[in-house]
């Protein structure tokens, strides 16, 4: 049996970020993943500005290597399509200036991002990175946990569980239950040759009337590829008996804004489905000697479905909490509360604003009315750009009086 200070379960973005941050402070760890890398990961492959921000904070050299090796596409904004086919182009940063502003966002296949992060960990951790190694169960030990894996037992003083949305091993700590209203179901596939992609690689979100509060997406990728998908809240999928792949095909065949662009496009492989555990502040994500990070902690943005940035942030914060635990020699419940508090401080506000936006999308007629009024309004793109950089502005957009004022002031 090998012994370590921290056992990290999962080598996705959450787990690898935790490992790299622990390594900076020389805290011993073992990181295990059931997969071998590179491997496919079902995802939209769109990364928000949070991703370069937190990787740079970990190490500017790692961010440079990521850009060099993975050659992600820089994406500069979002094209929103509202019910009624109203189109709004919203740059992430208004009047973007590459000298002054950080990279606004990326698109890159998750297969590449995840393999890159694993390679970075492998370079510093060597055999402490155990791939093709499945965690089967965890039990409480005398001074921490005993983790039973397909490659033998590991004894660890702490656990960072970053095992994603679909892990199924038995653990002696509570894991959040996936409630249908707090879960989205999504499918994605790849196409080659989709026409009319935005020259500045804007990602496209189609909030169509029949799929609200979900959306259909077209995300441009390097090498002439595009990631195409659809995601809808699970309770809505179940209630309306929606077949996501069929609805996605129907949009590609018949939506007047979409179908002409797919006429000569080729689908590469079958659509693949997965669930997204949407952010839920009620969950307990830490306790004596353990922390949950990323999807295991249900940290996906309820409006946009963004989870990679939040997984990286939570992995980073979990590692810093673990460093505090070893420095103070405190692993008790009360001390671990700080982890949840810091996650709420960093991600809580945007999660709750996104939850409220998502609730608003339940009313298609209202959304259509707002879109009609907003069409051609010169204040809207700037206002929506500020949503990405200023949380207080995003909050203002939930205030009906503020929205009415902007809509009337054409
Ligand atoms: C269809 C779809 C589209 C999405 N689109 C986007 C997007 O465009 N942008 C975005 O930011 N987010 C998107 N997301 C969300 C994003 O994919 C997740 O939030 C992100 O992967 C979370 O990272 P993580 O490290 O927490 O978990 P994961 O990336 O899931 O990593 C968990 C790891 O744990 C391992 N593991 C699980 N069980 C065990 C076990 N028993 N033993 C050992 N290892 C185990 C797995 O093999 C995996 O490698 C999308 C999700 C879906 C489903």
Where do the language-model regions lie?
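Predominantly flavin-linked oxidoreductase catalytic cores and closely associated redox partners
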Residues: 120-261
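N-terminal FAD cofactor-binding segment of flavoenzymes
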Residues: 41-84
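FAD/FMN-dependent oxidoreductases across multiple families
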Residues: 137, 153, 236-321, 327
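Glycine-rich FAD pyrophosphate-binding loop
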Residues: 7, 23-43
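Short beta-strand to alpha-helix junction loop
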Residues: 96-119, 238-243
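Residue-level detector of alpha-helix initiation sites
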Residues: 12-13, 37-38, 112
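C-terminal helical "tail/cap" subdomain of flavin- and related membrane-associated enzymes
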Residues: 323-410
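Beta1/beta-strand and adjacent pyrophosphate-binding region of the FAD-binding site
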Residues: 1-14
């Amino acid at each position: 049996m090998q012994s370590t200070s921290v056992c990290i379960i999962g080598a996705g973005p959450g787990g690898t970020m935790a490992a790299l941050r622990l390594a900076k402070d020389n805290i011993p760890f073992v990181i295990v993943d059931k997969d071998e890398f590179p491997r496919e990961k079902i995802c939209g492959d769109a990364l928000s500005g949070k991703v370069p921000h937190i990787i740079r904070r970990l190490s500017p050299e790692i961010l440079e290597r990521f850009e060099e090796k993975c050659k992600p596409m820089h994406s500069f904004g979002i094209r929103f399509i509202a019910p009624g086919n109203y189109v709004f182009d919203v740059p992430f940063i208004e009047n973007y200036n590459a000298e002054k502003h950080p990279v606004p966002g990326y698109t890159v296949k998750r297969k590449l991002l995840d393999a890159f992060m694993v390679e970075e960990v492998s370079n510093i951790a060597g055999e402490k990175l155990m791939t093709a190694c499945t965690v089967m169960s965890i039990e409480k030990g005398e001074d921490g946990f005993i983790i039973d894996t397909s490659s033998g037992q590991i004894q660890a003083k702490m656990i960072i569980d970053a095992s994603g949305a679909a892990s199924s091993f038995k653990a002696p700590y509570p894991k959040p239950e996936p409630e249908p209203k707090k879960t989205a179901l999504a499918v994605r596939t790849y196409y080659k040759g989709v026409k009319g992609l935005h020259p500045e690689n804007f990602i496209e979100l189609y909030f169509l009337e029949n799929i609200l509060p979900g959306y259909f997406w077209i995300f441009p990728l390097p090498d002439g590829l595009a990631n195409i998908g659809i995601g809808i809240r699970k309770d809505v999928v179940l209630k309306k008996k929606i077949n996501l792949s069929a609805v996605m095909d129907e949009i590609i065949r018949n939506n007047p804004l979409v179908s002409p662009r797919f006429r000569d496009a080729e689908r590469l492989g079958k659509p693949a489905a997965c669930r997204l555990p949407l952010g839920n502040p009620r969950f307990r994500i830490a306790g004596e000697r353990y922390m949950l990070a990323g999807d295991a902690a249900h940290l996906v943005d309820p409006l946009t479905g963004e989870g990679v940035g939040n997984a990286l942030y939570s992995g980073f914060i979990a590692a810093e909490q673990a460093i505090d635990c070893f420095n103070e020699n405190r692993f008790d419940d009360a001390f671990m509360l700080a982890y949840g508090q810091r996650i709420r401080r960093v991600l809580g506000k945007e999660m709750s604003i996104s939850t409220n936006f998502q609730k608003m999308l339940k009313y298609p007629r209202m959304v259509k009315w707002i879109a009609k009024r907003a069409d051609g309004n010169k204040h809207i793109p700037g206002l929506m750009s500020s949503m990405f950089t200023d949380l207080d502005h995003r909050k203002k957009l939930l205030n009906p009086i503020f929205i009415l004022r902007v809509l009337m002031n054409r």
